[in-house]
Amino acid sequence: MKKFQGVVQFIHPGGEHKVDSDGWTPWNLTMHKRKFMSVTGSYIDRSERVHNSLIAFWGEWEGPSKRVHSWTAEPQLPTNLVAPVFPGAASRIDGLQNTDPYVFGNKFHYTLCKQSRRDGRTTFLTRLEPGSLILFGSRLQEQFVLDTVFVVDDNIIPHNRLTWNEELSADVSETFRSVTLDPMYWDKNVSDEATHSLYSGAHLDSRFHSMFSFFPCLPYTDPERARFVRPVIDIPSVINHKLQQGQKGTELVPEQTKEIWLQVVEQVRNQGLHLGIGAVEPSISAVPDHVLPWKQGMGHTSES
């Protein structure tokens, strides 16, 4: 089947996860949402200097999280700043959501969402060429807002329900396996016939055509200065502001893709944000039982 080289506008749900009265958000069993998170990470400022500090950013983490700070609700701004928490390996249960894309640890990863249909047919998202650019974001107030920029590097690993454990074990962390791969292949809606692609994101130190993956962020020193709306990206040749779900793929040659990437960088920076290039992976931490659905009798557990 034909490979895809170019830019993908990828729409995923943009709503913010709620936080319970005790400050916790349980592992998600419902629709994917975003979280406004604080972790130790790395970012590049406008002068191209790399900083290591606490950062705040919008992203996906469907595992448990703990509130760090809260604000009065305002349109498009986050209501809660949360810290992602890794409780250790999950237990198999229907509906357990996976984290995809994944921006924590040594590499960004993307491996499931919209790559296949329930009947086993795969989409063009399994056939991305190295150097392709994925702009993950959401449609809010009739505009496309960005949370993750993913530059596909040349380490692409195909996998399916029969092969994933062997094919991917050497290339992913235990945390990624637990919060993304295990829930993915526990999901009965993921076809046995479909072969997915595990993509890794090009990093600052291993750029692809001078491009690297990043997420818009700010340093977190003062809660009132770290809060931000997701940046609007307006590039008519590749962005459709009317797109409410799904993806738009625009085939481009590598030089054109790089030009789009540069425009995205400029627009993110012009909205007062920095380029987050790394987020420390959450280490195993104790959590209350009520944030783990398999300890609450929710859904249906089954043997692996």
Please name every model-derived segment.
Residues 72-143:
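Short N-terminal edge-element motif at the start of the domain
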Residues 1-76, 158-304:
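Contiguous surface segments at macromolecular interaction interfaces
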Residues 145-157:
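Short beta-strand-centered aromatic/proline hotspots
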